[in-house]
Amino acid sequence: MDNNSTLNNITITVASSHNNTTTNSNNNNNNNNGSNSNNNNEQLNTLSNSITSLKSLNISGSGVITNNSEVNTPSEGNITPLPLLSLSDALSPLRELYSCLYVGDIRALMSNQYLKFEENEKIRILGFPEPHLEIDEKTQKYFSYQIIEFESDEDILSIAKSFEQYSQLILGRTPTQPVVIQECCFGLVLASIYFIKYELFSLPQAHDLIGYNDFFGTSKKHSHFEKVDSCTLINDITSYYYNNMSSKRKTTIFSNNISFTNLQTTTPPTTTTTTTTTTTTSSSNNSEQIESTSKNNSSGITSPTSIKPKNKVGLLKKLFNKMDKESSNNNNNKEKVEKIKEKKESKKEREAREAKEEKEREEREKEHQLALKNIPPAELYKHHMEQIQKIQKQQIAELNATSPDGGNDLSNGSNGSKNGNNNNNNNNSNNNNNNNNSNEPNSQHQNHNPITNLMDQELIENYDDGSDRMKNSKTIISPNFESLPDEYKTMVKTWDIKQESVDEHFEIILSLLHFHTKQRFYSSDPTNLPDKPKYYNVGNVCGNCTPPMILDPAGSGQMVVAKSFYKRPFDQICKKPTNEMKKLYTFREKVGKGGFGTVYLVRNNMDKSKSRIAIKKLPHVRKKEKKFNVKEIRVLEFTNHPNIITYYNSHMLHDEVWIAMEFMEGGTLAEASNQYPFQESNIAYVAREVLQGLAYLHGIQLVHRDLKSQNIMMTTSGEIKLIDFGLCANLSKGERIRMCGSPIWMPPEMIQQKQHGYTCDIWSTAICLLELANRNNKLRKNPIKTMFMVGSEGIKDPFEDPHKWSDEFHDIINKCLQMDPHKRPSAQELLKHPFIQLADNKKKMGKILSSIFLKSIVGI
C-alpha cells in the first residue's frame, strides 16, 4: 500500500471511530460509520500502529494528517501519544542553507501539532499565502508568517518594494528565531539578492537603475551603478524566478492536490472534521481547484488566490518567453553550424587538427617534466614566459575574430600601432636586446593587459617552493646591472622599471631577484662583508608595546596582564589521530583555499555549543610546511583576544594537520572592498579593530608579518578578526631580517632585507585601509614594480581621490607609511589617533557587513 492510501485509511478510521463515539456527530457521519460500530477496538489498534509507522517514515505535507487531540479522545489507554518535538527536532527534516536559515515544506511544518518550543523560541516563515492551511491554536504561537504578495507583475518596481523587508527578515534571524523559506519561494528570494547586492534599499534608486518604461538602458547617475546593465539584471531575475520558483511551486501545489484527489477517489466521500487541512467533498471540486491553482501559478509573480485575465500577460512572463526563444534559436543555430563544419572538414584538415592537438598534449607533458627536473630557475622562468606569451597571442586572436568591429580597439589598445604589433610578436628578441627604447612599447602593453599584469604575482607564488635546489643554488655576485647574467637582465626588463632607477637602486633589484628566484645575489664578494647577525636588538623600533590586559583565562572574569608568548611542545597541543575522527566531525563544504591550505565548514558532532566550526587542512610533509604549521598552531593555541580567531584544537592525520577553529559567517576584507564603497566611518571601525588585535600581539612580543586583506575576516555581526599566523615571529630575541609576506603589503625595510620589527604590521595595516578607500587598488597592477617603488621611495600618493577624505585619515595613513620604521607609531599609539574616534558602532557595521555578504548567507 502506498503512502497516500495509508494516510487515507487512517483519516477514515479516525473519522469513523470518532463519529461512532461522539454524541454530537451529524447524520451523515452516523450513517457512514454505523457499519463499523462493532470494530472500534480493532480500528484503534490499527490506528496506533499506523501512526507509529508514519512517524518512522517521516511522512508529511499532504494536508491529510488528522488532528491528534481528537484521535486520542476515544481510548487513551490503548494509544501511546507521540513525543513532543523541540525546535531543533522540528527543523531537522528541512534543508539548512546557512546558520538558522532553512528551506522546506511549510505545510508539513505548520500542520504538525506535536510541537513544544521554549518560551522565547519561534519560527519565522517567509512564503506565499496558503488558502488551504489552517494552523491549530495550540501551535500558532510558535510561528510568525511573512506573506509574499505583489499587487501586480506588470511593473518590476512593484516587486522591488518588498525586497527590503524580506532581506531584513533573513538578516535578523537568530538560533532561537530561525527563518524558514517556503520551498516554492526560494527562487524569488534569490532574485531579490541582485537588488540587495546593488544597494537597492529604496524605490527611487530602483527607478533610477531600471528606468520607468525602458528596460534596456543603463543608469549612470550613481558611480557604483555604472557597470550595472539593467537588461542583464532583469534577465537574471527572470531566469532565477522561472527556474527555481515557478516550476517548484506548480509541482508542489499540483502534487498536493493530486494526493487529495487520489484519497477521495479511492474511498467513499467522507467529511473529516479532524484534519488540519480542509479537504473537499468530491473529486470534481478537487479538479476545479487544481485547474484554478495552475492558472494562478502560470501568471507570473502573484498571489495564488488571484486570477489574471487571459488577455493580460505579465512583464516577467514576456521577458522570460523572449529570452527563452532567443536562447533556443541560438542553440539551434550553433548546432546547425557545427554540423555544416563537420561535413565540410576534409580528411586532410581533420588530420592536421589531430596533429595539432597531439602537439599541444606533448607540450603540456614537456612543461610538466620541466617542472620536475632540477633546472635553474632562470630556464624555468623563460619556459613559462614563452607559454604565457603563446596563450596571450591566442586569446587576442580569438577576441579579434569574435569582436563585432574586427577587434580594432583591442589591437590598438594592446599594440599601440602597426609597428607595435611587430614588437609584440618579437617579444623574446626585444627582451634579449639591451636597447631599452625598443622595449618600451612592450612595457606599456604589459601594464594594460590583465594576463601580463598577473604574471609577476603568479611567478612569485610559483617559484617560492622552498625546495633544496633553491638552497643549494650558487651565489651570484654582480656589482651593477650590466654584469648580471643575461637571463636575469631579461627578467628585470619585464618589470617595467626605468633604467636610471635600476642603476640608482641596484641593491633593491638584487633583493627582488632573490625574492623571485631564491638565488643569493650580492653586489660584492660576501666573504669580505661583515657577518650579519640573525637577530637585531629591538630597541625603539617596537614602540611603547606594554603587555596588554586580557580577561583571566582561568575564568575569574577579571582583567589580568597577558603573559609573554612561549613555545609549548608540539605533541602537547596537536592531538594524534583516532579511529573516531569520522564520528567527531562531519565535513559539509569547502569554504576557502589559500597558499597554505584549504578551509572547510564542519559540523562538530560531539559539542553542540560549537556545532559549526571551520577546519583548516594543511599539508605536513616538507620541512618548510612543518615549520609554518607548528608556528601557527602554537600562536593560535596561546592567543586569547576578541580580534583574533578562536582556536579549538588540532589533529595530526598522516601527512596533514587539521586545525579546528571558530567558523566566521561573512568574508574577508578583500571580498568586502570589491562589493561595497566604504565610508570613512566604516574604515575607521576596521582600523580600530585591526589595531586592537595588533596591540595585543605586539604586547606579547609577536609580529604577524603577513597582514593583508585576505587575512582579515569580517563577520555579519560586525566582528573583525586576524587569521593565518604561519609567518608570525617571536621578537623576544630581537628583530628579524628574513624577507617574507605578500608583495603588495610588504614594508620597505623588509624589501631592502634590513631588520624589521613590530612596525612592519603598521605599514601593512595602512595598505589594507587604502584598499577600502581606493577599491580599485593601483598597487595590484604590477606587484614587482610596486615592491621596487616601496623599497626605493615609499608610497608618495596613497589616495586615488585625496579630496574625498578628511585630514585625520590623511594624517594616520602618512604616519603609518613612514619609510623609517622607527618613526612609525605603535598600534597602541594609533588607537588614540583622532581618526579612530570617527568609527561606527558595531551594530551599524554589522548591518553593512550583512548586506555585503548577503549573497553567501542565502547559499548562492
UniProtKB/Swiss-Prot annotation:
InterPro entries: Kinase-like_dom_sf, Prot_kinase_dom, Protein_kinase_ATP_BS, Ser/Thr_kinase_AS, STE20_Ser/Thr_kinase. This is Probable serine/threonine-protein kinase mkcA. The keyword Amino-acid biosynthesis does not apply. GO terms for molecular function: ATP binding; metal ion binding; protein serine kinase activity; protein serine/threonine kinase activity. The active site is at residue 706. Its EC number is 2.7.11.1. Residues 585-836 form the Protein kinase domain. The gene is mkcA. Residues 17-45, 264-378, 401-450 are annotated as: Disordered. SUPFAM superfamilies: Protein kinase-like (PK-like). The lineage of its organism: Eukaryota, Amoebozoa, Evosea, Eumycetozoa, Dictyostelia. It comes from Dictyostelium discoideum. Residues 282-308, 440-450 have a biased composition (Polar residues).
